[in-house]
């Protein structure tokens, strides 16, 4: 340790940065492992104390983001997102441009409320169904869905972790935090520009391609089960806000083997009904003796289906926990809307710190029974949390060691006395490239200290630099690996790696131009 502590702190910080970027780009190690490795490396090289190296895990930003994952889960699991999507898209008709306009605006608003990934995951099945009804290949609608969601993340403070991070950096630089709705000043123009480009140009820049891997559509799934099991029940009676169905397969060595069942019987616990049974391609009639491999169609309350699907001896074909997400305004939806509304009021008024508002909402959702404790833990993207917590110390090291000042001085000497606009443009080009290769969250945590140093050297406000940084970090459009949302739509639409940049490049240019020329008008240097 004594030898390591004599390593030049600036050199150590820059070497750790380069190694981290290489690890991120190579994709050979989990993101969380890389982030933790960064924090530990900063400690072992003596750049940071142990408290500083681990401070990210107790940072209010990390707690705020973790709580927002629970809020997002509640909106998704109770069918609020599905309900909103169905109501809006049902009025859009089947014209391609109208669909793109409606889908783009809808996902932008939803992503501002529940995150980019949550919005795309919630609306993806619905958009595929709409594409089928409009006789359009999903490839014409799904990439616009992901890209419009990224634009929508700039509408509110809670739209993406990046927004929260740049706001915290602003406070750390001695300036005010960005307001909850303040991001809309740049977010609204970005959403409008993005949706217009998607509406009028995506047809020529996207492939006409189908994919065999399609997401679940609840009503189509229910109709398929009704047909396969020769049921006389109406589809609307199979699934609803309170009750649903799930198909389970009897596993080998299941305790159910040898028992007798018949259609219409209730299970021994009294909370589920056996609607029908199949053995191979044949629908079984009357009383049967259960064998391994038999398929049973069970109906009951969603909570009961979820509980029994996890029991030993049966294998659910589709998880009822996932199926219930596609029920509009399911159990707990009203409570969720009230709690989320209260959180938005707290965030907008600033009555309590953002992390406190989100934690209060998350606790209220758990205590009111909307989200179960295991479900709350499972909803949190621990990769994202660990990534941010592990990379925050790198930002601290950049500032503490003077590495940020060194890089800032190098950039400024490279461009000469060209003023803040050129400095901003150069910094944003670096950000744009990095955000296509590694997480945009990690990119911002790396670049933000450099942005603050450049602003301080030029004697200008850091706010336009930080807001512009958030804008360009959201422009992760050129590769499928740039964001999880880009990857989500890849298989259902049949996209290939080279499909993304064709539509992504015009959007990236739009975001870059807005960041360089429009942002400083709203947040002056």
Predicted regions and their residues:
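Hydrophobic transmembrane alpha-helices of multi-pass small-molecule transporters
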Residues: 1-66, 70-72, 204, 209, ...
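Hydrophobic alpha-helical transmembrane segments
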Residues: 10-15, 32-37, 63, 97-105, ...
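Transmembrane alpha-helix interface/packing and boundary motifs in multi-pass membrane proteins
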Residues: 20-29, 106-115, 147-157, 345-351, ...
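Membrane-embedded alpha-helical segments and adjacent helix-loop junctions characteristic
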Residues: 33, 40, 47-134, 194-207, ...
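Re-entrant/interfacial helical elements at transmembrane boundaries that shape
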Residues: 38-39, 83-85, 117-130, 142-146, ...
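Alpha-helical transmembrane segments of multi-pass membrane proteins
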Residues: 96-109, 135-152, 181-183, 420-433, ...
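Juxtamembrane and boundary regions of transmembrane helices in multi-pass small-molecule transporters
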Residues: 133-143, 153-232, 296-314, 470-525
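Generic detector of multi-pass transmembrane helix bundles and their immediately adjacent loops
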Residues: 408-413, 420-494, 498-513, 517-522
């Amino acid at each position: 340790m004594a030898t390591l502590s004599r390593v030049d702190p600036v050199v150590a910080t820059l070497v750790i940065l380069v190694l981290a970027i290489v690890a991120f780009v190579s994709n050979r190690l989990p993101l969380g492992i890389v982030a933790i490795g960064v924090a530990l490396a900063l400690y072992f090289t003596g750049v940071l104390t142990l408290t500083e190296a681990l401070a990210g895990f107790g940072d209010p930003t990390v707690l705020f983001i973790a709580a927002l994952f629970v809020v997002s889960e509640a909106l998704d699991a109770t069918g609020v997102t599905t309900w909103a999507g169905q109501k809006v898209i049902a009025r859009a008709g089947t014209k391609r441009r109208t669909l793109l306009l409606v889908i783009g605006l809808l996902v932008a608003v939803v992503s501002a409320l529940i995150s980019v990934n949550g919005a795309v995951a919630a609306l993806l099945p619905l958009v595929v169904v709409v594409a089928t009804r409009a006789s359009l290949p999903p490839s014409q609608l799904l990439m616009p869905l992901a890209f419009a969601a990224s634009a929508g993340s700039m509408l509110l403070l809670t739209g993406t972790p990046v927004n929260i991070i740049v706001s915290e950096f602003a406070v750390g630089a001695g300036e005010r935090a960005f307001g909850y709705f303040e991001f809309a000043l740049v977010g609204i123009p970005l959403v409008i520009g993005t949706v217009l480009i998607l509406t009028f140009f995506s047809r020529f820049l996207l492939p006409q391609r189908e994919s065999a891997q399609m997401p679940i559509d609840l009503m189509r799934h229910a109709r398929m089960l009704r047909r396969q099991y020769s049921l006389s029940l109406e589809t609307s009676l199979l699934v609803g806000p309170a009750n649903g169905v799930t198909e389970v397969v009897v596993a080998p060595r299941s305790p159910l083997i040898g028992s007798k069942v018949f259609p219409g019987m209730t299970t021994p616990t009294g909370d589920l009904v056996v609607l029908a049974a199949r053995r191979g391609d044949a629908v079984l009639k009357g009383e049967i003796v259960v064998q391994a491999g038999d398929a049973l169609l069970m109906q009951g309350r969603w909570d009961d289906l979820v509980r029994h699907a996890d029991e030993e001896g049966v294998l659910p074909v589709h998880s009822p926990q996932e199926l219930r997400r596609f029920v509009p305004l399911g159990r707990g939806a009203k409570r969720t809307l009230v709690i989320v509304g209260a959180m938005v009021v707290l965030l907008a008024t600033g009555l309590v710190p953002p992390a406190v508002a989100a934690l209060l909402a998350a606790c209220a959702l758990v205590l009111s029974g909307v989200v179960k404790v295991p479900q709350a833990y499972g909803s949190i993207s621990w990769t994202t949390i660990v990534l941010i917590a592990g990379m925050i110390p790198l930002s601290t090291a950049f500032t503490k060691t003077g590495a940020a000042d060194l890089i800032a001085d190098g950039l400024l000497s490279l461009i000469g006395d060209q003023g803040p606009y050129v400095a901003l443009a150069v910094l944003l080009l670096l950000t744009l490239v990095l955000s296509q290769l590694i997480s945009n969250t990690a990119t911002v945590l790396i670049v933000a200290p450099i942005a603050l140093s450049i602003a301080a050297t030029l004697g200008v406000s850091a706010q336009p630099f930080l807001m512009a940084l958030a804008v360009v970090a959201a422009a992760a459009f050129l590769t499928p690996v740039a964001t999880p949302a880009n990857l989500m739509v890849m298989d259902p639409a049949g996209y290939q790696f080279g499909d993304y940049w064709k539509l992504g490049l015009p959007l990236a240019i739009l975001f870059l131009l807005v960041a360089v020329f429009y942002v400083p008008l709203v947040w002056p240097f």
